[in-house]
Amino acid sequence: MNKLIELYCAICHHSEDSRIAEKMQHGSNNKSAQFTDVELMTAYLWGAQQGLLTRKSIYNFIRTYHLGEFQKLPSYQAFCRRLNRLAAAFAALAEVLFEQKLASSEPTHGYVLDSCPVMVSVGSRSNTAKTARDLCNLTRNPTKNLWYHGVKLHVFAQLRPRKLPIPCAVQISKASLCDLWAAKQIDLDCAPVADGRLYADRAYIDAEWRSHLQTERNVALITPRKRKKYDVLVSEDAVSTRISALRQPIEGFFNWL
C-alpha cells in the first residue's frame, strides 16, 4: 500500500511540470471529474508494475483489489477513452523521469544507439493487417527474415557499468523508416548525446553524419567496419566483436521492455 501511495504522490508532484500539465486534461470536462487524471495515471502504472500487460487486465485488477483506493473508478470504456487522451502526458512523464535518472547518474560518456521492431502482425497476416495504419506499416525484418506490420522503436541510451542503459531519447516510427534517417531526426530534434562515444551497428554508417556528430556534438560514432567481399582481416573481426559487446546492454534493455 505504501508503494501505491508513493506512486500517487510522485505523479501528483510531476504533474506540476509544465510539460506534463499542459498535456493533461485540465482544460477538458475531466477537470471536474470525480476520478482525476492523476488517479487514472496512478491506477494504470500501478497495474503495469504488477506485470499486467493489457488495459483490460489492469482495469480488472484495480476493480478487484483496489476499489477502496479508487472508489470513483469509471467504466472500462471511459477508462480506456481517457487513457487515450492522456497518451501525450504519459510520454511527457517518461521524459521527465528519464531526465531525472540521467541527472542523478554518474556520466559515463558512453552511449549506444539501436532500434527494435514492434510487431503487430507477422507473416501472411501482415499483408492484410489494418491495426493502427496511421502509425504502422509493412516492412521486412532482415534479422529475423520475416515480413511484419508494426512500428519501430528507436533509442539513444547512456551506458552504465553492470546495469541497463538509461534512455536519453526514445522515438516510435513506422516500421519501414530507415534506422539512420530516424537517428538523424532524433539528433536534430533534441541532440540527446554529447561529449563521448556512440556505439551503433552497421545500419548507422554514414560519413556525413559521423562528421556532424564529431564537430557539433563532440561525439565519436563507433561502428563495425563494413566487410568487403573476400575480406578476411581477423583484426577487424576483433573490433566488430568488441563493439557488439559494448552494444549488448541495449539488447538487454529491449528484452526488459
Where are these regions (language model features)?
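Short alpha-helical elements
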Residues: 1-257
